[in-house]
């Protein structure tokens, strides 16, 4: 037995390593202690057996066939370095510049003497504001509502300060594309709309926050002198208004002393949309925002605003949809089939759905623009357009393509909105007009055109659809706008006259000695100059701008329902409710990856950026063209590009073009908080742009991509003092560094990126790099070079882009090494705070690994496979280990320590429930916000305005995608309007009938009328559940005896059945026809043989359902023809072809005769029936049998159909006492029961079970059902062995209750029993007898949750019992699998699949009915076979195979015959690639 994995010693909080740093002498002396141990085998490690189980010979025991192949043996010596300190390296000044660390924004208290010269009140206010700002949440996420004394009385969490957010920034003032925004802005008393939002969701709460962060920034980095001079000059002019703004903003809080006359709804709307004061609510209507989708929400019409609110939660961790699609390559037009998974904002595709850690590719839908069906004829092809490229897909059916498109549209729409709700606030004074439009046939729609703000008067359009109250709502809106328009005109005229009078009076005061004529002339000239601009009288200054979390439709959009109508605008960059933790686009990624598409935002946003620049500069900045401090997170060349694209460069701009003359932009952060990580800012220096100018081809570059955040240029005394606070002791070290590493100075001054040779040499040199080292490891000086070069943020952006991870993912370290799968593959390892990733670097390879840290169990250090390499084994929960190799032992040790620390941190956060705190709080606050609005609506007079759904849209094929306020709601409801008479036809044992009882109970709950047609002995059981019963002839006991003696449906079975059961088959067919009459839908186990013909006769939809694979696939062999060894995809596929042909040829004569005589149908054949096109429901879990890659879209793996009967079952007192005694004795408790299996010698099997239980030293609950079935006639009764006290015999017990009481289960391996034991999360021992039991035994063993016995006897069974109760690895894997199975609801999934595929099933029946009308009974018609059938020059011919098989005496079901398929068939490479 190999020693247990050795975990490295962890000390300190969250598993922080205790690392000691010394000088060169200590580094040279460090030695790692090496221990030797064997490499883990890739299969489940064997547990050392006790001596009592080692003794004994099992050579005479019964061999159970088919058996599995021999386990692969691996011998890998392991070496473990126990000293963590040995992995560290000496830290000196030079080493700090070589490594890369994330910056910290929490070093504010470490201020120099110059900072402390500020007044104590200012400094104290700064600290108070800084702490308060951390606690504030942005409105983009949610409004944390105050307690309403007049409302529901729900407890409030905390009071928000409205000024903390300046809700709803001006839409045109926001960038087209996200970017990291500088916080050094002029802090003026400006309206709430005059601040842009941050591209990464880090919106500035208000100007004072920006100034505070400005102070914070300068404390954490050492800027070059030029940059600090510019910074000081810029800060001076901001200082006076800065102080005023802070004072005023601190006083501006929402008080609950609002006017008592204000309604609860008005106060809620004030909170959510941040009005200056509560506004009277005129009307409220349920409506739908119409863009590329329909979004359900509510419109609130107040005295001054038209507001729209919709609850739209994110689904970051939820798998929205999964299934198979075909995808064409970027350069290869051929379609390849993959398994796709739409999770969160990422569409991933895999070659193997069971290995979700290795995606073949990913599509980040945060960059998505549109998704649409392109093939209008067949409706199978659709595309997804992103900023980077267009992806082409093909579905198996038109409904599947439409479902995928709608799901993708929903995700794209959600990702373009910031936060968990959509909020739009349209000031009534900004509205131009309201127009009735006929956009939808089933709803009243109005178009509202609004002026974005009073800078450029850009026009936006919003479309709202009403399924009820539409005429009334539009009428109210029109009346309101007309009244507001007339009032505004009068106010504008009065204001203009008043301003002119004030101006003349002011001139008289300034020039008292001036002759009246000259003064009058001057004033008249000045007045005429103003009079030239007509907007003075017609377009007065608007009090506020349009505010929204979602980009509007452009007024120049050719079609409001264009796929790009809402996506042309960038992500939610118009988001005035900007979130602090943005989980969307990142500017640097846009700049690098999609520069050619940067002009997609159009010129309007470019103008709005210029407006914002001019607006923010204010009167103090208009005359200045001096440079402003620039801080960029981009490559050095980007800053210069922006400057040159706007104007001729001045000297100051030339200096700004190089990052060495800029403020460092990164601060190392020891915190994983996204709020701190995203304080990476950039500033864009430009001269004041002309109002409403168009930048042409630089629209996105000069406009939406740039912040335009200008700084005043007048220096202040405080900032000049700060400038001199540069620690002189650091200057010498910096100079030494420049002398010793002069080659790197060029990279700091130059604007071009790293060369190809430098990149490649660094890649092959290997090594490691840390991005988030603890503060005790690196000093404050270390981030100087890193920040100046700007590499940290770039590395994090590239890491997230490589693996399509959210922006909350924070890179911690990278390593170069090899991953070992088939051959060593060189690549790069990434460790973040939530994931462990790998990316191959060899040309021609695209291997990626994305492994969540929560799925990793442990990390072991071993010797490598190759000489001189050091190995690392990542042990994954419920998955095989993954092996890595490193060229250097210290790199391997560093990787192990970092990964173990991250694991400990993750486990600790998960334990205290703090792993996803931010996301959870966002969701809870959004729900509270939604509930508060709902409650306020109910108390108003608008409670009768309920949502009316457009039910007629179900028949509109081109209706837009619909998003519901309820995240679980869906318009994709295929439920039939009328209840159906559904018949389930099956034969076999109790395990074959039980799943149908569970399904029928679900159908009963849906309002349908189910019926089960099966053997008569199950009548009472079925009717006991309130289900109708219909009898089908046949004796399941005799059928089981035939299967055990001859194998299940083997040639020997069919040959004997033909000789002995001809009458039985005729009776089965006739009784099945009688039992199914009057049905509207037929669901059949294919072993019943009659259903497909009955459905054809009745012209009703037909489904198949079974407990084991019956559909042709290369992934698994047919469950009735399991080989002794794994034979590969070609053999697996041929087992289905062979079985279909043998099974049909053995019964074709009787079936066709029955069709002619009873059903009055012509003869048929396999080609005409096309059984593999029938929709199929598999009632097992995808976690047990992963859906094969070559399953068609109509083949569904729904999950187990469990019939839980244990809730009302009362266990006998003897049983509960036995269980309690076993627990008291601290003995393992197992269940042994082989169901209703027929055995030749019941006494012998019982004695073997007794001996095995005693040898394994366990307690056993025995269900001895095998002795209760029929035996051979004429045999004398044999005395049964006496049961020892360690065994308690029961007649029966519900599996769901019993398996929850025990430690392991041993049974025959039937599908239902296997599912029950796996759902309980306990190891499973399978002793297969016949049929699918061998298949499920192999699956249980393959996934590592149990044992499939190869031999049967007391010794083998005792060893299995002991291992199942003592193997920790197996126990943990079984527990994990149990959690996954319990999360499924197989019955509900099956019912939804029936609804979804109903039309497809009807189309098959109609097609067959049409053929029968035209075809004569004996005509041999050629029909098209399934399009997914694999055809190749090496594929065996099915007819020839059938002919050969008919000449064989028996098939692999018999124990005395060598299994079929021991010859490996030659297959083409194309066929192997599909397997």
UniProtKB/Swiss-Prot annotation:
Listed InterPro entries: ATG26_PH_GRAM1, ATG26_PH_GRAM2, EryCIII-like_C, Glycosyltransferase_28, GlycoTrans_28_N, GRAM, PH-like_dom_sf, PH_domain
UniProt biased composition (Acidic residues): 1416-1425
Record EC number: 2.4.1.-, 2.4.1.173
Record keywords, A-Z: Autophagy, Cytoplasm, Glycosyltransferase, Membrane, Protein transport, Transferase, Transport
Biased composition (Basic and acidic residues): 108-118, 675-686
EC category: transferase
Keyword Cytoplasm: yes
GO cellular component, one term: phagophore assembly site membrane
GO biological process: autophagy; carbohydrate metabolic process; lipid glycosylation; protein transport; sterol metabolic process
Pfam family, one: PH
Signal peptide region: none
Location of the protein in the cell: Cytoplasm; Preautophagosomal structure membrane
Record's keyword annotation contains NAD: no
Superkingdom field: Eukaryota
Swiss-Prot/TrEMBL catalytic activity: a sterol + UDP-alpha-D-glucose = a sterol 3-beta-D-glucoside + UDP + H(+); ergosterol + UDP-alpha-D-glucose = ergosteryl 3-beta-D-glucoside + UDP + H(+)
Biased amino acid composition, Basic residues: 30-40, 156-168
Primary subcellular site in the record, as a coarse category: cytoplasm
Function: Sterol glycosyltransferase responsible for the glycosylation of ergosterol to form ergosterol-glucoside. Mediates autophagic degradation of peroxisomes (pexophagy) and is involved in pathogenesis via peroxisome degradation inside appressoria that are developing into the host invasion stage.
Identification of the protein by name: Sterol 3-beta-glucosyltransferase
